[in-house]
Amino acid sequence: MAATATKTIDFAAERALAKDFLANFAGPRGEPKYLNILQDVANRKIRAVQIELDDLFHYKDADDEFLQRVTENTKRYIGIFADAIDELMPESTEAYAVDEDRDILMTQRVDEGADGGADGTDPLQRMPPEIRRFFEVYIKAFSKVTPLTIRQVKASNIGQLVKISGIVTRCSDVKPLMQVAVYTCEECGFEIYQEVTARVFMPLFECPSQRCKLNKAKGNLILQLRASKFLKFQEVKLQELAEHVPKGHIPRSLTVHLRGELTRKVAPGDVVEMSGIFLPMPYYGFRAMRAGLVADTYLESMSITHFKKKYEEYELKGDEQEQIDRLAEDGDIYNKLARSLAPEIFGHEDVKKALLLLLVGAPHRKLTDGMKIRGDLHICLMGDPGVAKSQLLKHIINVAPRGVYTTGRGSSGVGLTAAVQKDPVTNEFVLEGGALVLADMGICAIDEFDKMEESDRTAIHEVMEQQTVSIAKAGITTSLNARTAVLAAANPAWGRYDMRRTPAENINLPPALLSRFDLLWLILDRADMETDLEMARHVVHVHQNLESPALGFTPLEPPVLRAYISTARRVVPSVPRELEEYIATAYSSIRQEEAKSNAPHSYTTIRTLLSILRISIALARLRFSETVAQSDVDEALRLMQMSKYSLYSDDRQRSGLDAISDIYSILRDEAARTNSMDVRYAHALNLISRKGYSEAQLKECLEEYASLNVWQIHPNTFDIHFIDA
């Protein structure tokens, strides 16, 4: 037993096994996988050689013990694989850009080594293999292993290859990290090499070569920075995901070191899965005196996998492309996509359509003089408690590739924009992005928006229109990108909407902020026998079966939604000239209606016109169309009208108008406005849809007033002709 426990490992045999694996492992098509990678390295096409444990597992000559040793002593085996690659490295077969300085230095070193200089018997003068290498070796963990949370990584994992999931909260700048320090002696002229394996090292000052010792000369060493080897280095903070934090606990974070080709792969706000070596890091300086035997820990990253890719990075697989092509041919795709959002939440079809358009967005516009017009949609859901506002927010954050969820009461102005902190690596002041900066090119969901302090809420004004965060703190004056779509949820001023008060009193948000929202959706909880009964049945079904009732089609899964939206976002539709007058007329009519109203329901500004354009373009994107159609504009106007439907329906009840009478008034006013006795059916349907009425109500109105000889209906087209009485 004791002999087995103290079994020594023959690292020469391990190197031979690693070399055999690299030389003989075949890919899925029978090609030499790693030899092809080494050829690309020799041709200077790539620098990183990633060895996958999945390949080692399937290799016939590698046993379980070898796999276990690689997993438990990964740092040592990276060196073993690097030595094996040195022996297998082929000659270059293609011309590549030459680094003249590096090649001249290496040629000179080889010549000096042949003369007994750099490769002499003195170990400090022996050229380390690291300085010759122009590649980096990474070992990737098993793909099917469930990632650990930061809380689950224990002291027993020290030195092992682990896989951890989390969200990136901070990234340092990329700095050069010395890997091999090269010195030149003033007396003997020899090059002295010093390998650096830690973050700090003690430079050499006195030449230790044999020649200086024989001559009894204390040669002074000069550090040659140009001849030394540096590696890109970046420090990242990885924090536990919200769902992994036990109730009442603070999220834990872990320092991650990225080197070489892994730098600049992540940004704050990314949800990632990292595999790497869990290592201790002893304190140094005065902190070491206080810490004693205690050491800090960090993860030396070996591979990075993004949980949700950005839309522009999304690459469709073969089956996904076919599925999207089938969906695009579906005439009812707009409704199906919308109903696939949070299917367990009853109703809110139009709200879900608006949230779908928020995910799609419109392209950003940049004018010739540099002025930018945002393309992201901003939506505010305001309504009574218990109408599933927060659940909708959380579902959208789950579907979006990049999203940050926060609450108004728990967010400060600094927490939303940016804070100035001291970088522990360089002791410099650095900016740490807040929620809006973390959600750059994504969605920032702010719950309890009405409960934010006014001073904190003003920080959002610039983000919502200019899409930047301007900072002037601690000597740092800069502007950060915050190209985010804001999705806010708020309650009315008195908890519930009070119909006795004006909309402005109930909404209780400043006009400067309201005008920045493309859609302010009022969701009021009104008693209705049929609706309440359907909702109760739906909730009971979800509670018992843990899934939504049948929708008549299979709801699309979030990955499919992301794939469809990513394809739609690549389309850049334009507004044709023939629609310009139509949109302008629609906007002016909204302004006229608001001017006539005693208690206006919204603040209509020129931003409203831009909102109509953005929503129309988003609808065209969903159809993969290069041009905006009139139906897109009509749907955009309908959504804007339906967002206040609860208020309009109440106004109609107070004024004593039923749906039939109101539809007749709308059609009569349209005929008077156009000075025509005829109204086309399609145009009439668009008009009443904007006011929140259905096609069934329009047909009922047409039949009733046709029987009264007010108008005549065409038997085939249903066009309306007023009878001149």
UniProtKB/Swiss-Prot annotation:
GO terms for molecular function: ATP binding; ATP hydrolysis activity; DNA helicase activity; single-stranded DNA binding. CDD domains: MCM7. It catalyses: ATP + H2O = ADP + phosphate + H(+). GO terms for cellular component: chromatin; cytoplasm; MCM complex; nucleus; THO complex. A motif (Arginine finger) lies at residues 515-518. Probable component of the MCM2-7 complex (MCM complex) that may function as a DNA helicase and which is essential to undergo a single round of replication initiation and elongation per cell cycle in eukaryotic cells. This is DNA replication licensing factor MCM7. It comes from Oryza sativa subsp. japonica. The gene is MCM7.
